[in-house]
Amino acid sequence: MSRRCAYGYLFETPIPPDAQVMRKYTHAPHPLVLRVEGPATGPDRPLGGLRVHVGLVGRAVAYFPNVLFALSALGKMGIGSARLPYALRSAVDLSTGLESPLGGRSAVVRPPESVRVPIALGSPGETPVRVRLETPVRLVADGKLVRQLDLARLVSASLRRLELLWRIHGDDAEQDWSLDSAALVALANCVDVLDDRTRWVESDRFSRRQGQEHPMGGLVGEVSFGSGAAIFIPVLRLAGRVHIGKHTAFGHGHFVVVAEEDQRSVPATASSSNSPGVDG
């Protein structure tokens, strides 16, 4: 399908003919991440409600109206085995905080702001870093599922995810990837795991199109890393926003980074203009 087709680009995501990566593959990482939170309750929401986080990367930002329309149409069809309907109440641009009410023929949603986030390293420090896996993180290393997470595997998956998104969906094709991923993974391999409170959760997804179930289990919980982990905080925080591992389009692979103090982000190269970035 053409990259100008919303469905083809967001859900099929073919490899561009001029791509310098993933030449042996037929499909690239999707530039779309959906994550559902809830139900949320409150005075204005007595029956509870769901909050759907939509993440669009690079050129995919232009297709936000298509995604919003699809979510609205899905609500009319109903979700789950019981086909429960829902209605969209509002859309919030997290980069600006602007909320646009929905529902009704006169509803107007402004296109979201595209924010360029540089892919950078942080300042070295001794501060312990705690990572909270909020949705199942399903990683594969050496052909096997990762059931114990160390910093090297987390950094490796994060860098690979960011680099592929940047190369396939970014607008900085004239710039080269400036991070030495192999060296950074080797550095992360020297960092100790201080506390591992992760656990494996099993889940499956039934594909009506393929007529079979697909395993979607992964790690959730918290893991803490020791001295030397602080330099990776900006990379990990950005990777957490775009999710890592398998089934990211279904909301899996979301994690957040918690540190005892904020880390100052510095460019990975001498000039910040040379640092790769992800638009979203």
Would you name each region that the model predicts?
Residues 1-280:
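RNA-interacting cores
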